[in-house]
Regions:
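Substrate-binding pocket helix/loop in short-chain dehydrogenase/reductase
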Residues: 124-126, 133-138, 218, 229
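Active-site helix of classical SDR
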Residues: 149, 184, 192
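Short C-terminal tail/terminal secondary-structure segment
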Residues: 22-27, 120-123, 173, 249, ...
């Protein structure tokens, strides 16, 4: 069985489309004056992260595959004074260069990179996994993550900056059906630690590892099973994109100035219950 679980989808539905954000901290928020770049930001976790960073005072560049969805996201974030978007594929080095150049031209050098984009185009046992799909997963989730860091690292090393990678609890707990996705995210956790050592002291690098968050990415895995899956969570609910966004904003801010190389698990307590997250 094969399914496309890419974070990015062609467009926002009316139910998913957020209201235009109320920017209350543009001059005094924790990220006032900073420039952020968020990948996979047309919807779901990526859009929630972008929305939170703008609310904290940052100006934000968005990347994803679909121009129409990105245009809607920019409008929801308050328009071009607060956000710009560049459409393209995360595994395309040319797109990564173009996105960083566009954000730099619009707002200035990137201070905060959020590597959110991730895919899982195949579902099923590892022994049946198509190796072309495995390579694609690694190209986007791992190699692409490193590629984005390479695009901004030199500038950050001069000025300071931070990177937040969006990993997954699947990288810590074997998850049947999406095991290779989990392998890619375990590698992202280790990449995070390695980059933190190499890029210190000017650049902090951390990750967040959510369990099941209510997005289309997760819905494709748990269709018809949400109530069953939710029962495993001591906090009594699945995660929401804003839960991840709050953690990312914290790690991107000076409140986390002495934190680097860490992966912050966001799982509603499910790992304490000793059961699979999904």
């Amino acid at each position: 069985m094969e399914c496309d679980l890419s974070i990015d989808v062609p467009s926002l539905t009316s139910a998913d489309r957020p209201p235009t954000i109320c920017i209350v901290n543009a001059d005094s928020g924790r990220l006032a004056g900073r420039v952020a770049l968020v990948t996979g930001a047309s919807r779901g976790i990526g859009l929630a992260v972008a929305r939170r960073l703008v609310a904290e005072g940052a100006r934000v560049g968005l990347t994803a595959r679909h121009p129409e969805a990105l245009a809607e996201a920019v409008a929801a974030l308050g328009g071009p004074a607060h956000a710009v978007a560049v459409a393209g594929r995360a595994d395309d080095a040319g797109h990564r260069r173009a996105a960083v150049d566009a954000v730099t031209e619009a707002f200035g050098p990137v201070d905060v990179l959020v590597n959110n984009v991730g895919i899982n185009p195949a579902y099923g046992p590892l022994v049946e996994l198509d190796l072309a799909a495995a390579r694609k997963i690694l190209d986007v989730n791992l190699v692409g993550t490193l590629g984005w860091v390479q695009q901004v690292a030199a500038g950050m090393d001069e000025r300071g900056g931070c990177v937040v990678n969006v990993s997954s609890i699947a990288g810590r707990t074997p998850s049947p059906g999406i095991a290779f996705y989990g392998v890619s995210k375990a590698a992202v956790d280790h990449l995070t630690a390695c980059l933190a050592v190499e890029l210190a002291p000017k650049v902090r690098v951390n990750a967040v590892a959510p369990a099941v968050v209510k997005t289309r990415f997760a819905a494709a895995l748990h269709e018809g099973r949400e109530e069953e899956v939710t029962r495993a969570y001591p906090l009594g609910r699945l995660g929401l994109p804003r839960d991840v966004a709050g953690a990312v904003a914290f790690l991107a801010s000076d409140d986390a100035a002495w934190i680097t190389g860490q992966t912050l698990v966001l799982d509603g307590g499910v790992s304490l219950a000793g059961r699979p997250a999904g």
